[in-house]
């Protein structure tokens, strides 16, 4: 028998966790001062007057490093639950995880060969 009251705690958590950020934005909007002076409109750079233009174009190299980092960070997130239940899953899960890591290593070698990891 499927009973919906089993999910009451889930819905309560979902509503509360959605309401907290909305309330935080509403309260900060109501309580914050609206006056905009010259100091508030100026750009801030570590307590020093900014030198040059505030809008700089970043090289694509930074994005490639960030992309490779995100890929391997997500790999860690996927492999952690597998590592915690390694003894229960057996050989087939080990082979699947091995193939997953092998594909990621091949991707890293490809990015390395293409020069995506070169800093200069």
From Swiss-Prot:
Statement: the UniProt record of this protein carries the keyword Plastid: yes
E.C. number: 7.1.1.-
Bilayer topology annotation: Multi-pass membrane protein
GO biological-process terms attached to the record: photosynthesis, light reaction
Location, primary (coarse class): plastid
Keywords: Chloroplast, Membrane, NAD, NADP, Plastid, Plastoquinone, Quinone, Thylakoid, Translocase, Transmembrane, Transmembrane helix, Transport
Pfam families named in the record: Oxidored_q4 (PF00507)
Family annotation (Gene3D superfamilies): NADH:ubiquinone/plastoquinone oxidoreductase, chain 3
Compartments, as annotated in UniProt: Plastid, Chloroplast thylakoid membrane
GO molecular function, one term: NADH dehydrogenase (ubiquinone) activity
Catalyzed chemical reaction(s): a plastoquinone + NADH + (n+1) H(+)(in) = a plastoquinol + NAD(+) + n H(+)(out); a plastoquinone + NADPH + (n+1) H(+)(in) = a plastoquinol + NADP(+) + n H(+)(out)
Gene Ontology CC: one annotated term: NADH dehydrogenase complex
Spans traversing the lipid bilayer: 9-29, 64-84, 88-108
Subunit structure: NDH is composed of at least 16 different subunits, 5 of which are encoded in the nucleus.
Family, as annotated: Belongs to the complex I subunit 3 family.
PANTHER family recorded: NADH-UBIQUINONE OXIDOREDUCTASE CHAIN 3
Role summary: NDH shuttles electrons from NAD(P)H:plastoquinone, via FMN and iron-sulfur (Fe-S) centers, to quinones in the photosynthetic chain and possibly in a chloroplast respiratory chain. The immediate electron acceptor for the enzyme in this species is believed to be plastoquinone. Couples the redox reaction to proton translocation, and thus conserves the redox energy in a proton gradient.
Name assigned to this protein: NAD(P)H-quinone oxidoreductase subunit 3, chloroplastic
Gene name in the database record: ndhC
């Amino acid at each position: 028998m499927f009973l919906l009251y089993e999910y009451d705690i889930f819905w309560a958590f979902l509503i509360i966790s959605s309401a907290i950020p909305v309330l935080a934005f509403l309260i900060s909007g109501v309580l914050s001062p609206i006056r905009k002076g010259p100091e508030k409109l100026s750009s801030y750079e570590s307590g020093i007057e900014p030198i040059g233009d505030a809008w700089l174009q970043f090289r694509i190299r930074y994005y490639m490093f960030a992309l490779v980092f995100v890929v391997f960070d997500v790999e860690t997130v996927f492999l952690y639950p597998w590592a915690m239940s390694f003894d229960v899953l057996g050989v087939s899960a080990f082979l699947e995880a091995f193939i997953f890591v092998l594909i990621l290593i091949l991707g890293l070698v490809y990015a390395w060969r293409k020069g995506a990891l070169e800093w200069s």
